[in-house]
Swiss-Prot record:
Biased composition (Polar residues): 385-397
Region described as Disordered: 385-406
One term under GO cellular component: plasma membrane
Sugar-modified residues: N436
Signal sequence extent: 1-20
Ranges in coiled-coil conformation: none
UniProt-recorded name of the protein: Variant surface glycoprotein 20
Amino acid sequence: MFTQAVIALIGLVSIRTGKTEDVTPCTTNCGCWARLEKQITVYRGDYSAAEENLKENKKNFGKIIAATVLGSEKLKATVAPVLLSAAQIIHECEEALTTARPAILDAEKKVAELRALYDVQQKLKEGNGELQLHIQDDTNINTAKEVPKANLGNINKKGCADDLNTPDAATIDKTNIETEGPTPKVITHVHVEARCQRDGTPTNGCHDGQLGQNGKLEFSLTYDSKDTNDLATWLADTATKKQISATEVDFIGNLNTEANTAIKGLKSSNPAPACSKKIRDYKTIADNSKFNLMVTKALIGKTDAEAGQESKEPELAAAITKYYGTEGTKFEDQLWKAIERTPAYLGDQKKEQTTKIEKLETLTEVGEATARGLVKQLAAGAQARQTASGDDQSAENQCGGKKEDECKDGCELVEGVCKPVKQGEGENKEKTGTTNTTGSNSFVIKKAPLWLAFLLF
């Protein structure tokens, strides 16, 4: 009963872990060629996915940058908390890839070299080259037909096939990759195989008779992992093909061990944890430790708040719901769609064209559209200042020409000189008889960010 319970428990654990069975080592050139590809594929997908996700995040980050200039004041405020989180996500991924790239490149290089060696070994092994001497007309070797085959050391053109599962049926994944050792050295020796037939009878060897007419002397090369040398027995039975030498060869050296170490090292440098995050995902953005602070500053209006001064619930949740939907459920529609619908400007060498941020595909286009947006803002600001300056100068001229009894209707005497009434002062003087500080407050309000004014009023 106890034994049955243990067996059942082991079976249950195996099912829950979902662990792939450990597999036996490869034993053939093409089997090892396939096994290496399966091993590195376990991590290659994570690395390539990290690069692709970083590329996509950077593209979307460019849209955020463009929106900070081209967007409405409300959109700019909505973007502000996302900007910081998105930048940190991209930075962390780039840091991870800085470590990961050399690791995957080194592993890919070693695996490619080792697979190439297994492929070459397979071509050598299947070369089937021979040197055949067939004595025919007399006991002399003096015609081409007496050398019917002379391609000793031939290399087969066909190496290992593209289908990995044909030479190696094993399944390799993250549950068993750690148990994989270095692929074996399938070829460690090269042998000369020989056969000598003294006449037309296949069983008549050359060890007990002279090679003569219709005799055959044949040599070939074979490759394996054995040190077999049957020279001694062959000399007593030369009519039978045997390996008469065993020369040690090592095509691989330490490369199999180095490749195995490099592949397993990809686990520790895997960029997936840092690079699987997407900046268009609300939860990813909101997980940033400074997200609530930026919401407090940009969306609630407490611009002087710093760490530890973040707004609390329900104020914080209310702001998030207003701009991103309840717990970010409208993050895509209310932020990203708004960003992508925002007008942008590009030139076509002759005139400026209006497009949308979603159409900006490259960093160059983002840069141009943002620059053109800045130019428009600078031009608008300059125009506003020029208009204000003109109005001030006009008022100065109108009041300056008036006599003392005419100095009214927006003008006042200052030390005997008629000058324009400063904004707010006249009204305050009428109400209180003294100069109020409203003018100073008005200046502060004018200088506050437009988006803050939008939120507060």
